[in-house]
Amino acid sequence: MARPMITGALALAGMLSITHGAWIPIKASLAQVLLDNAWRETLYSGQSLKPWPWADTWPVARLSVPAQDKSMVVLSGANGAALAFGPAHVRTSAPPGSADNSVIVGHRDTHFAFLQKIKPGARLQLESADGAVHHYQVSDARVLHETDTDVLAATGSR
């Protein structure tokens, strides 16, 4: 009697473990669909729309790297919750697409992993919430510690 119960308990634990492991990628994929929808609605309506009702962030831009066929929604507020779903704009920096330092951050091992292949001269596009598309060229690529705030300083240029 004890052996079937142990076997059943182990089988249940295994299924729960697999389900939990699969939940994270499923949640991440669904989040990207919801972020894309919120971005399209933001462009259409001109209003900042949350991707889901309980979100504490919203799309503020779309960052694209055409040469790598990468495109991702940039979220407002560089906090842990936003960064779990994609790159995020540091609210204390200039708005995305403005003529000053606009800082967008992301985890280098997830959403910004493609930046390992970025070289000076690469072209980036940033679509701001007003629908304007801004073109940039990479001049330097480096990993900064979160306490390195020199990049937040206003420069008056893009």
Cite the ranges covered by each PLM segment:
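Solvent-exposed, non-transmembrane regions of membrane-associated and secreted proteins
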Residues: 4-158
